[in-house]
Amino acid sequence: MSEKITLSGVPETMLQTVYARAKESSGRGAIRDRKAEETIGGLQYDFSLADRDKAMHSGVIARTIVLDRLTGAWLQEHPGGTVVNVACGLDTRCYRMEGYGRWYNLDLPETIAVRQRLLPENGAISQIAMSAMDDWGGCIAEQDTPALVIIEGLTMYLTETDVQRIFSVIAGRFQSATVLAETMNPMVVKRFREKSIEGSHAKFTWGVKNGAALAALLPDFRLREEHSLTEGMAEFVPVYKLLGKIPAIRNISNKIIVLERK
């Protein structure tokens, strides 16, 4: 029996993104996400806006490709490490990855309530019902293992102070931490609107030019590297293998910025 889900604002965007992954997985196949397909199959929700929003779909798939690659590489280097997925929504990366010791999915109580119904988790996978800006570090049981923190699809809905607060929580909890943070260019924040996101009444509010600019705001972190989502786009739109080499296009695209605890 399918479930009817009602959300609004930023939490509603999680339905759009899991739908994009499910649709890609069952269609063209640039990613494979059977858990997303199962989740969408059990929902009553009008995805007509998401169906028409090609930009949103492409962006979700591109960042999934890049983040899966970076997460998998980190887990190979740190087997048994701890992963914290901040603002997890209905993300299913924990089902696509292996090699972690513990995986925490963190989001607002409203969101976690939905996740618990659709993706009940236990064992190595835990859920934390808190805001990303709350002091959630005390909910992490592991003491000395290296940690990977993923911040996907969130910073563009926050303020600079909010972003700094999240990194302060991370620095206060982990001595050894790598952060994968998705960011949006300020020009895009001001001028670009995704149809399905607008339909959920969520608004883009903050952006940062590049990894160096983000690191300058975070005294406890150093920049390791950054990746344009054009890298992910190139996996399913071949022309991006060329377009991604053009600085203006590479720089205007969302980025996955990799930072390390100092």
Question: Can you say where each PLM-predicted feature lies in the sequence?
Answer:
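Short amphipathic alpha-helix with an adjacent loop that forms part of the alpha/beta core around
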Residues: 136-144
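Core SAM-dependent methyltransferase catalytic element
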Residues: 236-262
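Short alpha-helix
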Residues: 201-231
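A conserved beta-strand element that flanks and buttresses the S-adenosyl-L-methionine
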Residues: 149-150
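Conserved beta-strand signature within the Rossmann-like core of class I S-adenosyl-L-methionine
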Residues: 173-186
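Rossmann-like AdoMet
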Residues: 1-84, 88-130, 143
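A short, conserved alpha-helix within the catalytic core of class I
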Residues: 157-169
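Short, glycine-/aromatic-enriched active-site segment of Class I SAM-dependent methyltransferases
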Residues: 186-202
